């Protein structure tokens, strides 16, 4: 909990003003679609901050649950509100990140959605050995064909747990370049090396 609180306040310092900007289109889009917006203040505020972080990382407001890929068409579908949201709301009652839900959802419903989301992103054990995190081999989201949790989420969690330096193994060049970009945004040094069957990124 302490680490989560520290991360929240760090993100608020970086993106608090941007989060207020996102409030406008989120509410407008929900009204237009007949959806509700997550009524739980902490997760809702975090989601706005994470969207702002995604925008700073990638130049677009991609869904905060997923790292964009090297597939441009898929990436367009990931721009929040993503093109998968309606299908998920029709099926489970809320979109994957829990930002939007059916119009009749209660705070208790959103709490259940949040618990499921946190189980995916914080309940999955990190493959971390001797300061090296292997991000490969995660569950693949059926609709998007993307790993959950992705490399960026795993790395942020690992840094919170063990700090720097951190070695990271990723499957693709795109993931490696994203980590290099994260390093630049967070005042870290990132070194990328291509291996035979994976990419290695050293963060310090």
At which residue positions do the language-model features occur?
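Amphipathic alpha-helical interaction surfaces in cytosolic regulatory modules
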Residues: 149-161, 173-189
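Glycine-rich repeat segments that build the extracellular carbohydrate-interaction surface of secreted
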Residues: 165-172
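C-terminal edge-of-domain segments
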Residues: 184-204
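Residues in the short beta-alpha loop(s) of Rossmann-like NAD(P)-binding domains
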Residues: 103, 172-173
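An N-terminal amphipathic alpha-helical segment
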Residues: 122-163
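Long, distal/terminal scaffolding or interaction modules
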Residues: 2-124
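Short aromatic/hydrophobic contact patches that present stacked aromatics
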Residues: 140, 167, 200
